[in-house]
Amino acid sequence: MTPRRTGKTDGRLNLSHILLVVFIAALPLAAPLQAADLPPELPLWEKQPSDYPIGQAVKEQVRSVPAPPGSPSGLNRAFSSVSVPTYSIHRPRNPNGVGLVICPGGGFRDVWIDREGHDLALWLKDHNVTSLVLKYRTRPADLTPANAWQDYQRAVQADARQAIRILRKEAPDLGLQPNKIGICGFSAGGQLAMMCALQPEPKPPETEVSGMPDFAGLFYPGIPDDVGQLIENRTAPGSAAPGICPIFIMNARDDKLTPAAKCVDFYAKLLKAGVKAERHVFSKGAHGFGLGDGRGKSTALWPAGFAAWLQDSDMIQDK
């Protein structure tokens, strides 16, 4: 006769029970190890630029805070006092020919490299877009002379254009088309991307490839007050500069730092000038929402909308 089970144990645990307990106990410790492996940082310049040197009173600093929900990298770092710019390239297995420089935000005092850099790059990598995440030079705390801001802007734009050139130079090895190299950015990084798209490039040496973008993505960008004049300078009859590239703009209605109304006005000016542009204003998200997870159902859809816009702009070819 088969003994009846009483529900009691003899005090011994079998191997499967032990392994289960060990696995559950280790979960909190294992979580940080699941952060995505990121590509290495490489120096942006072979030699530090002598035209626009930016010195810092202290060495480069980094601080970390908890990563936002759904972060592909699992990291959330802010770099400050950056005097030596670097870059990292995310390479998909099957590149579709599109290359994109990503400029994180941080008010030009910080560079939020993960939530506004690597996270988007990892998302785009899954969609076969090659991305270069730029850690550009930050603004020193002691920029007080009247012309210092202009000096800094020239320096940081030089960093962004150098990143574009790197993708163009390495296009054959990266599987890119040199006429499909764009720039995008978040907040201050969006302003940087905008300035590279709107302002003509200082003439590079004869042997240098162009640092002008073929398209631009502006994600809750800072909009300067003179943006209308910048557009007019590039689109006025007789202007020697090439036309303004296609531009994608997105923001949240409740953004208090970079108000959506300024993006709407900027978009209207682009349309009036005949620039190919697309604009999205989401009902929720506030400022600094990165990929948008946890900030609003529609807000979290913006990366897919950006990728679709690249298709509509004939950057990504439909299959």
Predicted stretch roles:
Residues K256-K262:
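Conserved alpha/beta-hydrolase "acid-adjacent" motif
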Residues D114-L132:
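Short amphipathic alpha-helix adjacent to the substrate-entry channel of hydrolases
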Residues A36-P95:
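N-terminal cap/lid segment of alpha/beta-hydrolase-fold proteins
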Residues A158-P242:
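Primarily recognizes the serine-hydrolase "nucleophile elbow" in alpha/beta-hydrolase
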Residues G97-G105:
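Short beta-strand element of the alpha/beta-hydrolase
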Residues I249-N251, D255:
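Short beta-strand/loop motif that positions the catalytic acidic residue
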Residues W112-I113, D119, Y136-G175, R295-T299:
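Catalytic nucleophile-loop/oxyanion-hole region of alpha/beta-hydrolase
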